């Protein structure tokens, strides 16, 4: 009983009244409050502005491209870039290109847009002396598609009122052929060739053409065997079997 009533010294101290501690109880983590941060971290903590910040005016500048003056020239017949690279061979190798050389335009005869188109043969004969070698070469390349008209002569161009169907005259009737150019119409007067062999449907198309008629084949007649010959052949076979059965076979 005495053992139960007795208490240890540590338990008596815990059960006794606690004396008020003179110091404030500290936190376990000892975290710093917000008011103490400026004194502890003076370098990191931003300082209060002593005076109001002076605002600087913002100036907006507009970027404008420099205007390049290009002389107004009527539409040239060829690109100035092509002529620039062609004339590059005659220039000295040490010369550097400038802006004036890049935008330099060569004198090219311009074609008026509102003037009527004259005859190509008359125009080529009158301007052969004026055109240089390159213009003459380019004009030949452009007029290459008109070589068929040149071979026909002036007969097709002498009658501008008549039309030409360019090889499709077979689709026209007899009345419409009267207004076609006579150069092309002369070829149409030929009589069309008629096939000597009459037309017949192709009978060799599988699945489309009707099936061909089957031809009946005659069966070959086999020679008949007489009953007497069969009896003789059966009797000979039976005699051979009987002789084989009567043979004495000795097995040691």
UniProtKB/Swiss-Prot annotation:
Compositional bias (Low complexity) = 105-116
InterPro entries in the record, alphabetically?
Answer: Sororin
Supply any other comment.
Named sororin after the Latin word 'soror', which means 'sister', because of its critical role in sister chromatid cohesion.
Q: Where are the stretches annotated C-terminal Sororin domain?
A: 230-252
Residues with PTM Phosphoserine: 21, 33, 35, 75, 79, 83, 107, 154, 209
| Compartment(s) of residence | Nucleus; Chromosome; Cytoplasm
Descriptive protein name: Sororin
Function recorded in the entry = Regulator of sister chromatid cohesion in mitosis stabilizing cohesin complex association with chromatin. May antagonize the action of WAPL which stimulates cohesin dissociation from chromatin. Cohesion ensures that chromosome partitioning is accurate in both meiotic and mitotic cells and plays an important role in DNA repair. Required for efficient DNA double-stranded break repair.
Organism of this sequence? Homo sapiens
Free-text note on domains in this protein's UniProt record = The KEN box is required for the association with the APC/C complex.
Share an example GO biological-process annotation for this protein.
cell division
Q: Which family does it belong to?
A: Belongs to the sororin family.
Composition bias, Basic and acidic residues: 86-104, 124-140
Q: Where is this motif: KEN box?
A: 88-90
Question: Where is the region Disordered?
Answer: 1-48, 72-142, 199-222
| Modified how | Phosphorylated. Phosphorylation, as cells enter mitosis, disrupts the interaction with PDS5A and relieves the inhibition of WAPL by CDCA5.
Gene expressing this chain: CDCA5
Q: Where, per the database record, does this protein carry Phosphothreonine? A: 98, 111, 115, 159
Keywords, in A-Z order: Cell cycle, Cell division, Chromosome, Cytoplasm, Mitosis, Nucleus, Phosphoprotein, Ubl conjugation
Its assembly, as annotated, is: Interacts with the APC/C complex. Interacts with the chromatin-bound cohesin complex; the interaction is indirect, occurs after DNA replication and requires acetylation of the cohesin component SMC3. Interacts (via the FGF motif) with PDS5A and PDS5B; the interaction is direct and prevents the interaction of PDS5A with WAPL.
């Amino acid at each position: 009983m005495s053992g139960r009533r007795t208490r240890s010294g540590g338990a008596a101290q815990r059960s006794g009244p606690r004396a008020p501690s003179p110091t404030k109880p500290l936190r376990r983590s000892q975290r710093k409050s917000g008011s103490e941060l400026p004194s502890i971290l003076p370098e990191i903590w931003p300082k209060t502005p002593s005076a109001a910040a002076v605002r600087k005016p913002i100036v907006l500048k507009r970027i404008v491209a420099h205007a390049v003056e290009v002389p107004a020239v009527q539409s040239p017949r060829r690109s100035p870039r092509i002529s620039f690279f062609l004339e590059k061979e005659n220039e000295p190798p040490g010369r550097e290109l400038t802006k004036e050389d890049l935008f330099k335009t060569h004198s090219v005869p311009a074609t008026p847009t509102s003037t009527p188109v004259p005859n190509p043969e008359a125009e080529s004969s009158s301007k052969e002396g004026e055109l240089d070698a390159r213009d003459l070469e380019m004009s030949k390349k452009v007029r290459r598609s008109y070589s068929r008209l040149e071979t026909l002569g002036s007969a097709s161009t002498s009658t501008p009122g008549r039309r030409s169907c360019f090889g499709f005259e077979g689709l026209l009737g007899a009345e419409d052929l009267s207004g076609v150019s006579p150069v092309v119409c002369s070829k149409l007067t030929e009589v069309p060739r008629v096939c000597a062999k009459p037309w017949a449907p192709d009978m060799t198309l599988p699945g489309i053409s009707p099936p061909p008629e089957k031809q009946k084949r005659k069966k070959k007649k086999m020679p008949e065997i007489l009953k007497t010959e069969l009896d003789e052949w059966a009797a000979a076979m039976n005699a051979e079997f009987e002789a084989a059965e009567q043979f004495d076979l000795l097995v040691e």
